[in-house]
Amino acid sequence: MEVILLSKIKKLGDSGAVINVKSGYARNFLIPKGKAILANKKNIESFEAQRIALEKEKINELLIAQSRAEKLKKINSITILSKVGKEGKIFGSVGVRNIIKEIILLGIKINKKEIRLPNGLLRQVGEHIVVFQPHSKVSINFIVKIIAKN
C-alpha cells in the first residue's frame, strides 16, 4: 500500500516521501497516528502544494538566520565585566543569559537556544569562543572577552 509520510520516520523516510508499506502497518499504525496519508492522486497533489510552501518557508528561515549571523559576525566579540577573585577566577560564572544580555544591548535579538558554550560555563578571565547557531545549517564562532571589574 502506498502512503505519503507526514513526518520523518526512522527507517522509512522523510516527510513527503511516497513509500510502499504493508497494508496492515499503514491502516493500523501510520494512518491512525497521523504519520501518513493514503497516496492517491488528490492527496499527492495537495501534499505537493504544501511541500512547495514549506520549502519556501524553510528557505526564508535560512536567509533570516544567515542575516542575523552576519550581523553578529560584524561585531566579532563582546565584552563582559565580572567580579574576579584570586588567580583570575570569576565569582560565579558567565552563562548564556549574560551573553544574550550583552548581545541584545548591541541591537541583535537572539534566543537562548541559539548560543552554545563548547567548554561549558565561562569561569575564567580572558577570551572564550562561543558558537552562535540560529539554524541547523548556519553557525558562526564569536569571542566573549571577560574582564575584571574593579
UniProtKB/Swiss-Prot annotation:
Taxonomic classification? Bacteria, Pseudomonadati, Pseudomonadota, Gammaproteobacteria, Enterobacterales
Keyword Ribonucleoprotein in the entry? The reply is: yes
Top-level taxon in the UniProt lineage: Bacteria
The molecule here is called Large ribosomal subunit protein bL9
User: Which terms are listed as keywords in the entry?
Assistant: Ribonucleoprotein, Ribosomal protein, RNA-binding, rRNA-binding
Q: What is the stated purpose of this protein?
A: Binds to the 23S rRNA.
Please name one Pfam family that this protein belongs to: Ribosomal_L9_C
Give the record's GO biological process terms.
translation
Native species: Buchnera aphidicola subsp. Acyrthosiphon pisum (strain APS)
Q: Which GO terms describe its cellular component?
A: ribonucleoprotein complex; ribosome
What NCBIfam families does its record include? L9
Residues in coiled coil: none
Family (UniProt): Belongs to the bacterial ribosomal protein bL9 family.
Keyword Transferase set for record? no
What PROSITE patterns does this protein map onto? RIBOSOMAL_L9 (PS00651)
Question: Example GO molecular function term?
Answer: rRNA binding
